[in-house]
Amino acid sequence: MVDIVAILATIVGLSVTIGYGVSQLASGFFNISGAEWLVDNSGRPTLMAQLVGLVLIISASCLSAMSGLKKGIKWLSNINMGLSVFVIAFFVIFGATFFALQTFFYAIWDYLVAMPAMSTTVWSGNGEDPSSALQSWQGAWTIFYWAWWIAFAPFVGLFLARVSRGRTIREYVIGAMIIPSLICLVWFAFVGATAIDLELSGVAQGAIVNADISAQLFKTINLILSPELAVALSVVIVVLLMTFLVTSADSGILIINTLASGGSQSQKQPNM
């Protein structure tokens, strides 16, 4: 029963991730090619574009998963890390660096201060006071994202246990907990602060905040680069998105197979 629940949680968590990812992938392809069938009149990715992206990601994920942990998954993960460092370095150097550094430290402090209250408070609005807006925000952001991440717990826990075999506890804590958290903070601070600075300074004039969420990153780079360089960086980001989605999906496939086979890594004995 526990294995079944873990499998369902992994499937649901991955589905949300891939759903968001293929939308951003479609927006990236549109930013590169300008093909009108990729987005509708409101700027949102079309159903056809998302289906094409989904087929592409799932096909690549299956091929990667079949190659095993030490081949396709490791190879794609190395590409993913290299491209991630390149994109983050770009925003650190060419983005709103000073504003981003301020945002980085303010965000850490606000997170530490707000986390206890946000972890224990559930707002219930009555339609007449500010708590109604807080309830709507909490449901759309805090509760939704926490539920999404919690659904990833069985998948990520088992995957980290598998790839961390032979590592010390110190190596695990630093490599799987501290460094990824810092990278996420740097990413949100520098990429987010660059977009916010463009809006506050009047350069964007609403182009970023009014864009579909899947296209906001590409709107940001369009504003800080020439058209040719923006297309080039869009290609890098699209490839990065694909490696993120494929490595997430193929790792999930690997863990689902392990759960379904009762923990056996040979995946020959079903456990359902």
What is each PLM-predicted segment?
Residues G68-G72, A161-R170, A249-N271:
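Alpha-helical transmembrane segments
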Residues G19-V22, A26, V246-N257:
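Membrane-embedded alpha-helices of multi-pass transport/permease systems
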Residues M1-S15, K268:
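Loop-to-transmembrane boundary segments
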Residues A9-R167, I174, I179-L240:
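Membrane-embedded translocation segments of transport machinery
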